[in-house]
Swiss-Prot record:
Binding-site positions, Zn(2+): 591, 595, 651
Family per record: Belongs to the peptidase M13 family.
Entry GO terms, CC: membrane; plasma membrane
NADP listed as a keyword: no
Catalytic activity: Hydrolysis of the 21-Trp-|-Val-22 bond in big endothelin to form endothelin 1
Name of protein: Endothelin-converting enzyme 1
Species of provenance: Bos taurus
Main location: membrane
């Protein structure tokens, strides 16, 4: 995500903590003034020499008292006292239990900060990863459960719909009674599936239109509505590559390395086919293998994410007529008019596409593929998305595949956790008001706004010191930073029952019919998407719901968003020292702010438009600075598998810039407000606590399978390298922890972008 603040050394801090008031003036240093046994001598009886000596002694004593007073003031100013409040003792205990103080912080700061936490927190059953974010999300889940199960007369109609949805999910008796019937009826309604019975041979276009709009699936490609990157005040239809059942093309193309996953995926497909009435396995398996082979063909033409980072290069705006020429396998005008009905689409409709080559190749692939296989593949997309809403047999099949895919150990997780997560994913904004009222203090927005303001100021201070950026680009960058809009806690409309009900007016939840409610929501969410096409983008439309433990930056809106779910401990606690808050939520704020200037965000101007607003000299200098990080992170590995320094570049830039901005902001805060009290027993300065707080946010564990998946899909580096990658580039970290030059956490060569 420097000042006059005294950066006390570790030894000085320990000494101060060990002194009590009686120790400051030990008895053997006390001075007693005693007169003669016969009483004091009269002043008049003293000789002139004695009188002069007495006056001199008095003056010297007065001077000594003055000096002691000055030293006392300086002592109090420079030496923070120890915080012994209940909150400080509690947070100290938490910090200590997470640490492994036997590890040298200059050798391995992540293990120093998180070693205790990792030993005490193996990956829980039913999970493939666990960390600070997971812990807080479980806390939020428990709150949501209570709110959903305890309805009140004052809730809005939208909130009641969320409660109906949740209760239908919890009605396992009804779900078990229906078994696979809801999905089997849906497949029949769509014209059938050759895996389970007869199918309509002439309905390719119709099936594609229905599964795209009514059920929000994305076979072959994805279609959605979003702000036009080059005209951010307008929404536009956008089309992009899609259609893989596994998380990344790498799973299909690196067959030897991923043989276990591919076998598990095929077995999962066969099992679902059998559960849906597909008959004998020797009939189902060959057809499912064909679907898997088709997905492999899609993977072969899918562009890797690391080659799609330059948005100026991949952005193309075409008309519907031009798209028809580019990808003729789809009858685009009927397709678009059907899914966007009642909006009328003609041949001149602008459409943004992100990979011409992919769309051309997928069109060729469709034309050269048997219609039966195309139908099987499209219905498989629907089955894969909807089977989790069916009975326990489908849950068991899903868990078995998750064990292969992510290393998740099968467990009997409480049903309510599944239902809370699904309700939040589906109707998170509808239940948002309940969560906000229960957890979000009225002044939290103001406090968060103040922190954001401090981080922005610190970022702009760093911006002014950059040597690689020309002055014109620097001026424009400052204007962009000034223009970043803050969204905190929740979108305003959710707290107005009338506005909230208006948003969810067209969605109806039916008691006790879980599958039906989920299908209705897919259709509703697509209708909401289609409805945006002729409207301007709206800041109140968030990509994350209020309970989410996360944050994000939107380049087309030039805004940073912090849901209520993350504005809690351990990221922020009003009773904790600000060293911890700046190291927690401060770094999160700095991270999102820096995204406005990472390798993708920097391409958007202050108004959210994709255009070349940098001078060429600064673009080239930026590429040189970022090349350092690509190499640095590319040298890290997990279980012998390297981190992709190119794919993770944007997040690595944000991690480093966020830490730097938050540190500078904390120094500014101390300069303005004075040194804080320190925490007891740790023997750490507040500057050291800042870095420790940052690191402990990322304490986490993952299964080997999940680590592999993260390395090939996640744009973030693994947690360990988010910590050591950032602090090893921080000169201030090495100063505060006294790391020798050349030690692992203080390399001679450091990378810096912002």
């Amino acid at each position: 995500m420097m000042s006059t603040y005294k950066r006390a050394t570790l030894d000085e801090e320990d000494l101060v903590d060990s002194l009590s008031e009686s120790d400051v003036y030990p008895n053997h240093l006390q001075v007693n003034f005693r007169g003669p046994r016969n009483g004091q001598r009269c002043w008049a009886a003293r000789t002139p020499v004695e009188k002069r000596l007495v006056v001199l002694v008095a003056l010297l004593a007065a001077a000594l008292v003055a000096c002691l007073a000055v030293l006392g003031i300086q002592y109090q100013t420079r030496t923070p006292s120890v915080c012994l409040s209940e909150a400080c003792i509690s947070v100290t205990s938490s910090i200590l239990s997470s640490m492994d103080p036997t590890v040298d912080p200059c050798q391995d700061f992540f293990t120093y900060a998180c070693g205790g936490w990792i030993k005490a927190n193996p990956v829980p059953d039913g999970h493939s990863r666990w960390g600070t974010f997971s812990n807080l999300w479980e806390h939020n889940q428990a709150i949501i459960k209570h709110l959903l199960e305890n309805s009140t007369a004052s809730v809005s109609e939208a909130e009641r719909k969320a409660q109906v949805y949740y209760r239908a999910c919890m009605n396992e008796t009804r779900i078990e009674e229906l078994k696979a019937k809801p999905l089997m009826e849906l497949i029949e309604k769509l014209g059938g599936w050759n895996i389970t019975g007869p199918w309509d041979k002439d309905n390719f276009q119709d099936t594609l239109q229905v599964v795209t709009s009514h059920y929000h699936t994305s076979p072959f490609f994805s279609v959605y509505v979003s702000a036009d990157s080059k005209n951010s005040n307008s929404n536009v239809i956008q089309v992009d590559q899609s259609g893989l059942g596994l998380p990344s093309r790498d799973y299909y193309l690196n067959k030897t390395e991923n043989e276990k996953v591919l076998t598990g995926y095929l077995n999962y497909m066969v099992q679902l086919g059998k559960l849906l009435g597909g008959g004998a396995e020797d009939t189902i398996r060959p057809q499912m293998q064909q679907i898997l082979d088709f997905e492999t063909a899609l993977a072969n033409i899918t562009i890797p994410q690391e080659k799609r980072r330059d948005e100026e290069l991949i952005y193309h705006k075409v008309t519907a007529a031009e798209l028809q020429t580019l990808a003729p396998a789809i009858n685009w005008l009927p397709f678009l008019n059907t899914i966007f009905y009642p909006v009328e689409i003609n041949e001149s409709e602008p459409i943004v596409i992100y990979d011409k080559e992919y769309l051309s190749k997928v069109s060729t692939l469709i034309n050269s593929t048997d219609k039966c296989l195309l139908n099987n593949y499209m219905i498989w997309n629907l089955v894969r998305k909807t089977s989790s809403f069916l009975d326990q047999r489908f849950q068991d099949a899903d868990e078995k595949f998750m064990e292969v895919m992510y290393g998740t150990k099968k467990t009997c997780l409480p049903r309510w956790k599944f239902c809370v997560s699904d309700t939040e994913n589906t109707l998170g904004f509808a239940l948002g008001p309940m969560f906000v009222k229960a957890t979000f203090a009225e002044d939290s927005k103001n406090i968060a706004s103040e922190i954001i303001l401090e981080i922005k100021k610190a970022f702009e201070e760093s911006l002014s010191t950059l040597k690689w950026m020309d002055e014109d680009t620097r001026k424009s960058a400052k204007e962009k930073a000034d223009a970043i809009y803050n969204m905190i806690g929740y979108p305003n409309f959710i707290m107005d029952p009338k506005e909230l009900d208006k948003v969810f007016n067209d969605y109806t939840a039916v008691p006790d019919l879980y599958f039906e409610n989920a299908m209705r929501f897919f259709n509703f969410s697509w209708r909401v998407t289609a409805d945006q096409l002729r409207k301007a983008p709206n800041r109140d439309q968030w990509s994350m719901t209020p309970p989410m433990v996360n944050a994000y930056y939107s380049p087309t809106k030039n805004e940073i968003v912090f849901p209520a779910g993350i504005l809690q401990a351990p990221f922020y606690t009003r009773s904790s020292p600000n060293a911890l808050n700046f190291g927690g939520i401060g770094v999160v704020v700095g991270h999102e702010l820096t995204h406005a200037f990472d390798d993708q965000g920097r391409e958007y101007d202050k108004d959210g438009n994709l255009r070349p607003w940098w001078k060429n000299s600064s673009v080239e200098a930026f590429k040189q600075q970022t090349a350092c990080m690509v190499e640095q992170y590319g040298n890290y590995s997990v279980n012998g598998e390297p981190v992709n320094g190119r794919h993770t570049l944007g997040e690595n830039i944000a991690d480093n810039g966020g830490l730097k901005a938050a540190y500078r902001a904390y120094q500014n805060w101390v300069k303005k407000n004075g040194a804080e009290q320190t925490l007891p027993t740790l023997g750490l300065t507040n500057n050291q606590l800042f870095f420790l707080s940052f690191a402990q946010v990322w304490c986490s564990v993952r299964t080997p399978e999940s680590s592999h998946e993260g390395l090939i899909t996640d744009p973030h580096s693994p947690s360990r390298f988010r910590v050591i990658g950032s602090i090893s580039n921080s000169k201030e970290f090495s100063e505060h922890f006294h790391c020798p030059p050349g030690s692992p956490m203080n390399p001679h060569h450091k990378c810096e972008v912002w």
